[in-house]
């Protein structure tokens, strides 16, 4: 796949439409944004385009219709202005007469943010790049621009108009966020970067299982270290008796039906490591119990497991950590995840961290060496990338490179 970057397309003194992803958590009571990390992530791309004399028009979404976080982007524009240290004009329109008039009249070297693109019903439709290239959104905005940049890796798994329609009608490239994500994650699939260790935790069992199946099928993983609910699923698949309480947890999560798939992986010789001990809570006290003698609801992996997992991490060249080992909302069950994260950072290997819970743990660890660590902005896109699924936004940029840039 050929994904053009800003180095390949030297946009200058032009008007450029930039798809970013500044979808952020919103306080349900106040309506205020709770985190601006995604907003800060796009500053590099925007500044670079502005420094080349371009007029930069930003388009993004926030939430989905019917959800509490489905809002306009006015507050986002203020935060963008703060982090860019320059004026960002907010336009309370997406493709109507007012938006088009503001784009036509904007000065080169300035930045304009359109309103929530999901206010446009077409944006909610999943369709092919060709179909979206004929949408009203694309047809109305395309004549106003000389180029398009997609910097929204976190939404790359969506096949929506603002993500896949414009590359078919405009010279298009990836932005710096998109470029860094693809470059970092490509290391997962590169030969000669062994051993590769994947640390899979959290509560999204089906997603984790799909990723593990793809890693095993493509022989990409030397070790897969499990924690969270996916570890419990594999423990049951191995025949360990986790007790009635933990079976009920898996049943309530609707994942007991996945046990045969996990068992098939184990029987195939897949390099899946299962915890040898767990932390449980009884009467307000925390205890560590062997994996085959668990007497209460599992809250975390045990210290012996952390020691075993750390030995694999020390020798790894690539480490991918997705999801916590335990219930990290409770400080008592945060240590295993924090220790494995700390050991990964101290290892000589390259670390890729994904998932909101793991990223939140990074905050208390200190400054990160960007040459050794990549913090992924992708949620669903990261999962699908690791599971070997297609990412429509990347495919659209590839089509643009083959069909639009050569015209």
From Swiss-Prot:
Reactions it catalyzes: (2R)-3-phosphoglycerate + ATP = (2R)-3-phospho-glyceroyl phosphate + ADP
Keyword Transferase: yes
Gene3D superfamilies, per the entry: Phosphoglycerate kinase, N-terminal domain
Broad enzyme group: transferase
A GO term, aspect molecular function: ADP binding
InterPro entries for the chain: Phosphoglycerate_kinase, Phosphoglycerate_kinase_CS, Phosphoglycerate_kinase_N, Phosphoglycerate_kinase_sf
Family in the record: Belongs to the phosphoglycerate kinase family.
Protein name: Phosphoglycerate kinase
Source organism: Metallosphaera sedula (strain ATCC 51363 / DSM 5348 / JCM 9185 / NBRC 15509 / TH2)
């Amino acid at each position: 796949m050929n994904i053009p970057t800003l180095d390949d397309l030297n946009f200058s003194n032009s008007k450029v439409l930039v798809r970013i992803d500044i979808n952020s958590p919103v306080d349900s009571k106040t309506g205020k944004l709770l985190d601006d990390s995604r907003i800060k992530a796009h500053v590099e791309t925007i500044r670079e385009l502005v420094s080349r004399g371009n007029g930069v028009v930003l388009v993004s979404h926030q939430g989905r219709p019917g959800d509490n976080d489905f809002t306009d982007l006015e507050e986002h524009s203020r935060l963008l202005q703060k982090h860019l240290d320059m004026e960002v004009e907010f336009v309370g329109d997406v493709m109507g007469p007012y938006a088009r008039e503001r784009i036509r009249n904007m000065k080169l070297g300035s930045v304009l943010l359109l309103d929530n693109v999901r206010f446009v019903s077409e944006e909610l439709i999943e369709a092919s790049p060709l179909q979206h290239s004929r949408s009203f959104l694309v047809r109305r905005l395309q004549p106003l621009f000389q180029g398009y940049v997609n910097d929204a890796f976190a939404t790359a798994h969506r096949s929506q108009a603002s993500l896949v329609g414009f590359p078919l009608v405009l010279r298009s490239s990836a932005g710096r966020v998109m470029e860094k994500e693809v470059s970092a994650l490509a290391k997962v699939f590169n030969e000669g970067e062994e051993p590769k260790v994947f640390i899979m935790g959290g509560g999204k069992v089906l997603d984790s299982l799909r990723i593990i199946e793809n890693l095993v099928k493509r022989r990409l993983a030397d070790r897969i270290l499990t924690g969270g609910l996916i570890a419990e699923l594999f423990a049951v698949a191995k025949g360990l008796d986790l007790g009635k309480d933990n079976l009920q947890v898996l049943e309530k999560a609707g994942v007991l039906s996945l046990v045969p798939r996990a068992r098939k992986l184990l029987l195939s010789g897949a390099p899946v490591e299962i915890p040898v001990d767990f932390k449980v809570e009884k009467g307000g006290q925390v205890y560590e119990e062997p994996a085959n003698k668990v007497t209460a609801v599992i809250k975390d992996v045990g210290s012996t497991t952390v020691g075993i997992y750390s030995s694999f991490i020390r020798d790894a060249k690539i480490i991918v950590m997705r999801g916590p080992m335990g219930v990290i909302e409770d400080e008592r069950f945060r240590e295993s995840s924090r220790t494995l994260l700390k050991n990964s950072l101290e290892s000589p290997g390259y670390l890729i961290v994904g998932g909101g819970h793991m990223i939140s743990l990074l905050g208390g660890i200190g400054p990160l060496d960007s040459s050794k660590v990549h913090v992924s902005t992708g949620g669903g896109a990261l999962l699908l990338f690791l599971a070997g699924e297609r990412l429509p936004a990347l495919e659209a940029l590839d089509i643009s490179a083959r069909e639009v840039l050569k015209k």
